[in-house]
Amino acid sequence: MAEQKSSNGGGGGGDVVINVPVEEASRRSKEMASPESEKGVPFSKSPSPEISKLVGSPNKPPRAPNQNNVGLTQRKSFARSVYSKPKSRFVDPSCPVDTSILEEEVREQLGAGFSFSRASPNNKSNRSVGSPAPVTPSKVVVEKDEDEEIYKKVKLNREMRSKISTLALIESAFFVVILSALVASLTINVLKHHTFWGLEVWKWCVLVMVIFSGMLVTNWFMRLIVFLIETNFLLRRKVLYFVHGLKKSVQVFIWLCLILVAWILLFNHDVKRSPAATKVLKCITRTLISILTGAFFWLVKTLLLKILAANFNVNNFFDRIQDSVFHQYVLQTLSGLPLMEEAERVGREPSTGHLSFATVVKKGTVKEKKVIDMGKVHKMKREKVSAWTMRVLMEAVRTSGLSTISDTLDETAYGEGKEQADREITSEMEALAAAYHVFRNVAQPFFNYIEEEDLLRFMIKEEVDLVFPLFDGAAETGRITRKAFTEWVVKVYTSRRALAHSLNDTKTAVKQLNKLVTAILMVVTVVIWLLLLEVATTKVLLFFSTQLVALAFIIGSTCKNLFESIVFVFVMHPYDVGDRCVVDGVAMLVEEMNLLTTVFLKLNNEKVYYPNAVLATKPISNYFRSPNMGETVEFSISFSTPVSKIAHLKERIAEYLEQNPQHWAPVHSVVVKEIENMNKLKMALYSDHTITFQENRERNLRRTELSLAIKRMLEDLHIDYTLLPQDINLTKKN
C-alpha cells in the first residue's frame, strides 16, 4: 500500500496528493545516490553497548528512540518502573542527552571518515530550483474561494455515505410495519371504524409512528438540510460548524414538537371523558410541554457553548495553531524527497505545498488522512477565520502529533524495505534524532550547514523566505548550522506539545461547563414541570425558597468560587498550558489548566496546585506573552579607573552585542548606578534579549556568556577593584 503525501501543487493551481510506493521511493533513492555514498565505512573498533543500540550499521545513522530501545546516552537504570505513567507532561523520564559526547562516541565507532553532516543520497544532485513533479490526483477536495480559508474536508457528506447501523435497520423495519398498519386501518372496513380506548385505530398508528419513528424521519430531514447547506457555498462558509454541532439538538426538538402536535390534534378534548381520564390527558400534555421547553433550553445552551468555544479558541489559539501547522509542514517537507528538484525535467509552475495529517478515530484504530493547503493558511486572518476552519486546524494539532515522513528516510538510511507511517515525535530525545535525519536529508554531503539553495530543492522561494528566519543566526550568515536546526526542531516539538495540551484542557473545561449548565437546566425543567402540573403551589414554592436560602449559607462560597473560576478561565485567561508565569514572586510553568484549578510546575519540577478563584485575585506575570525581555548585568570597578578605560569598556561591550545579534539587541546602555565608599563604582549593563524568559535555560546560558565576556574585557583592560586603605595599628611587646 502506498502512503499518501502532500505535494507542492501543480501548475494549474490545483491541489493534489501523490502516492509514493515504497519500491519506487527506494529505487529513486538508489538512482540519486552517488558512488561515494554507497561505499561502506569500516568500524574502528566494536561499538559500545550504548552506541550499538543507537547505530544499526556503519552506513546507517542512529535511529530515533522508541519504546523498545533505551535512551541515547543512558548509563543508569531508572529508579522507577518503566510501566509507570509519567508524573508530568513536560518532564521526560529519560536521562539527559549530551549531543557533543554522543557525536564523539559515534565517530569513534564509525571511524574518522564518518561525518554527522554528511547528507543523504537524496542530495547527490545539482543544486537547482525546479517545479513540482507530475503527480497523480487523489480524492482531495479543496475550496475555490480565495476569501475563505481553505482546508481539506474529507468528510463532506460522510454521513450520507456511511454504512447503515443495526439500530437504523430496526427503526426502518418498525416504520414499515407501522406504516402498513396505518394503511390497513384506513382501507379495511373492519378496522376503519374500530375504536380502542375511545380512539380510532389509525390515530393510534399515527401516534405510535410519531413516537417511535419520529427520530428516523427527523434524521432524514436533518441530513437533507445539512446536505443542502454543505452544497450551498455561501452558507457553508460560516454556519457549517454550528450546523453539525446543533444537528442532534435540533433533531430532538423537532421530534418533540411532532409528538406534542400529534398528541393535541389526535385526541379530541371536546369528547366527554371521566374526570380521571381527563386529568391524565392534561398531565401528559403538560409533561410534553415541559419536556419541549427543556429541549429548547438545551438547544440554546448548545448554541451558546458552541459560540463561546469558537470565539475563545480563535482569540487565544489561532496564531499559535497557524505557526504550529506551518512548522509541521516544514518538517514533513524537508524529511521527504526533493520534489522540486525531481520536477525540474517537467517544468511545471511551483506553488505552495500541502500538509497531510492523520487523525485517530475513537471507535477503532483507523486513521483518517486530511490535507491542508499551506498557501491559504498563510493568508488566514484571525478576524475572518470561520469556526469550521478553526475546528479543522485544532483537530490537526490536538489529535495528531508532530511527525516526519519517515519512510523515505528509513528506506535510504536503513534499507529495510518496509513501509512505515509518518513517525510522530513523542519526546525531546526523538526530536534530536529527527533533527539529525532531516538535516542529513537536506544538507549537501560533508557539509555542516544548510544553505538557501538546499531548501529550494524542497520548497518554493516564498516558503524559503519564511523558513530561513526561524533559525538562529541564519538571517545574518545565510547558513543554517546543525546546532541551530536541532534547537529549532526541539523548540517546535515543545511548543507543539504545549499547544496540544492547551487545546485538550480547553476542551475539558468546556465539557465541565457543559455538565454544570446541563444540571441547572434539568432543575429548571423540573420546576417548570411542577408548575404546569400545579403541584408546586405557592406554599410549596415558599418552602423551597426558605430551603434555598439556608442552602445558600452552606454552598454560597462554593458557587461564588465556581463563578469566579469560569470568568477566570474563559474571560480573563491570563495564561495557557506551557506558559511560564510568575505567581507570588515564584516563576512556574503551567502544567495543567482545569475549570476550578491550575497545576503549576516549579523550576525543580515540584507541582503546585492553585484554585482559579484564588488566582483571579493575584497579579500574574506571563513570560510567554511578553515581548523580548531585558537583562541587567551588574558589576563593580575601582573608583580610580580612568574615564578612558570606561569608555573603551563601553565600546568593547557594544562590539560584543553587535557580534551576537541572534542573542542580544544592539540597543543597550552602560550606566554608573552609584559610588560606594569612595572606592567603588557600581555599574550596570542594560540590554534586551531576542527571547523572553519563557526559555529559562537559554536565558541563563546567554547571561552567563555575557558575564564571562565582561570579565574577559575587564581583564584585558586591566580594570580591577581594590579595597580602601586600612589603618593597621601594631604594638610592640617587650
UniProtKB/Swiss-Prot annotation:
Annotated compartments: Cell membrane
Organism of this sequence: Arabidopsis thaliana (Mouse-ear cress)
Record-given protein name: Mechanosensitive ion channel protein 10
GO annotation, cellular component aspect: plasma membrane
Coiled coil: none
Pfam families: MS_channel_2nd
Xref: PANTHER family: MECHANOSENSITIVE ION CHANNEL PROTEIN 10 (PTHR31618:SF20), MECHANOSENSITIVE ION CHANNEL PROTEIN 5 (PTHR31618)
Tissue spec: Detected in the root tip and throughout the vasculature of the root and leaf.
General function of this protein: Mechanosensitive channel that opens in response to stretch forces in the membrane lipid bilayer.
Transmembrane segments: 164-184, 196-216, 249-269, 288-308, 516-536, 551-571
Topology within the bilayer: Multi-pass membrane protein
Annotated Polar residues bias: 65-75, 117-129
Extent of Basic and acidic residues compositional bias: 24-39
